[in-house]
Design a protein with these regions (language model features):
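Transmembrane helix-bundle core of multi-pass membrane transporters
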Residues: 3, 112, 116-182, 209-211, ...
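Short loop segments and helix-boundary regions at transmembrane helix junctions
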Residues: 1-3, 58-61, 80, 99-142, ...
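Hydrophobic alpha-helical segments embedded in the membrane of multi-pass proteins
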Residues: 42-51, 67, 71, 100-103, ...
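Helix-loop-helix "hairpin" substructures at the membrane interface of multi-pass membrane proteins
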Residues: 86-94, 100-105, 109, 157-235
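Transmembrane alpha-helical segments in multi-pass inner-membrane proteins
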Residues: 221, 231-298
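Cytosolic-side transmembrane-helix boundaries in multi-pass membrane proteins
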Residues: 1-16, 20, 194, 201-208, ...
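Structural signal for alpha-helical transmembrane segments and their membrane-water exit/capping regions
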Residues: 14-30, 58, 131-135, 177-184, ...
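Single transmembrane alpha-helix segments in multi-pass membrane proteins
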Residues: 19-83, 107-113, 251-265, 299
Length: 331
């Protein structure tokens, strides 16, 4: 129980302490406007990170998600701008394509027994290359539906405006929590991440589960690509470069073990929030380079990976400790 909950508790503690520090330096952090801006600015990252959580929980990795964002953007820009397709038709079309691509990668990973790192790396290069073939330049997306979605928001007390993008990200997190803890699929993901051999012995179809895991990951990455295209009002082949690393960082900082089997979607939300908090603090400060965000995230990653290793060793030692037999003399 401690092994499963301690990383999440530490992540929440880091976020609370970080927010309180930001509040002492800049009282404006108490405004709901700032909180809503953090949600909007990191909506696409939060959506991707939920999918990445399931991948890492299973003991895998998905390096293709950044390229999925790029492909989604240029595909939408092309079919909406050049072919006149309505976004209401283009969105489900590209979502189906994204899910199919993830299912194909999941099938290759299980059938060929090739590490997910290699398969998804190939997927990353493939989709990035296809994105460049579509267009090397940024393609603006001019459509009334895009204008409506980008400005859609609800006023909340304190002057904040909760955007549709931020609300969608929170909805994805809630659905992710439900999938992870209240469905057979979620249980299978945890079992496979804990011990794939045991999962097979228990009769769990690792192939079916692996396919669904990567389908979910790329499906959410495609959804994030739609959100990103609405946020930027454009499609660009260079979009999403390095986002896969930001997503992995959010998941790890959120308390999910890289070895798989332990972690929560809620922790990932706080991992994304910590990154957003650091970026916002740097923007408020005005004197620090934006690269300090990467430095701070790097330091946090070192700390959390060390924590993960310590917890894993402690758990293994407790599991392998000898059992002392007590002989009771019978009279």
């Amino acid at each position: 129980m401690i092994k499963r909950n301690l990383p999440l508790m530490i992540t929440i503690g880091v976020f609370v302490l970080g927010y309180l520090y930001c509040l002492t330096q800049f009282p404006g952090f108490a405004s709901t406007r700032v909180i809503c801006n953090i949600l909007t600015d990191n909506a696409f990252l939060g959506i991707i990170a939920v999918g990445m959580t399931f991948v890492i929980l299973s003991g895998g990795i998905d390096l293709s998600v950044g390229s999925v964002i790029a492909f989604t953007g240029v595909f939408l820009a092309k079919v909406i701008g050049d072919f006149g397709l309505s976004p209401l038709l283009a969105f489900p079309l590209v979502l189906v394509m994204g899910c199919a691509f993830g299912a194909f990668m999941g099938l290759l990973i299980d059938a060929l027994k090739i590490p997910a790192f290699i398969i998804t790396l190939a997927g990353m290069f493939f989709l990035r290359g296809v994105s460049y073939l579509v267009s090397e330049e940024s393609i603006p997306i001019n459509h009334p539906i895009y204008d409506t979605l980008s400005s859609l928001a609800w006023k909340i007390p304190g002057g904040g405006r909760l955007s549709a993008m931020g609300l969608l990200m929170l909805a994805v997190v809630v659905i992710g929590i439900f999938l992870a803890h209240r469905t057979r699929f979620g249980n299978q993901v945890y079992v496979i991440g804990g011990n794939a051999t045991s999962a097979n012995l228990m009769g769990i179809s690792t192939r079916s589960t692996t396919i669904r895991i990567y389908m979910l990951s790329t499906g959410l990455a495609t959804l994030a690509g739609i959100v990103f295209s609405i946020y930027t009002q454009a499609g660009y082949a260079l979009a999403g470069v390095g986002v896969e690393l930001d997503a992995i960082a959010s998941v790890v900082i959120g308390g999910t073990l890289l070895s798989g089997g332990v972690g929560t979607v809620l922790g990932t939300l706080f991992g994304v929030a910590i990154q957003g908090l650091i970026q916002t603090y740097i923007n408020f400060d005005g004197t620090l380079s934006s690269w300090w965000t990467k430095i701070a995230i790097g330091i946090l990653l070192f700390i959390f990976i060390a924590l993960q290793r310590g917890l894993t060793v402690l758990w293994e030692n407790r599991q392998s400790s000898p059992v002392t037999r007590v002989n009771i003399a019978q009279r």
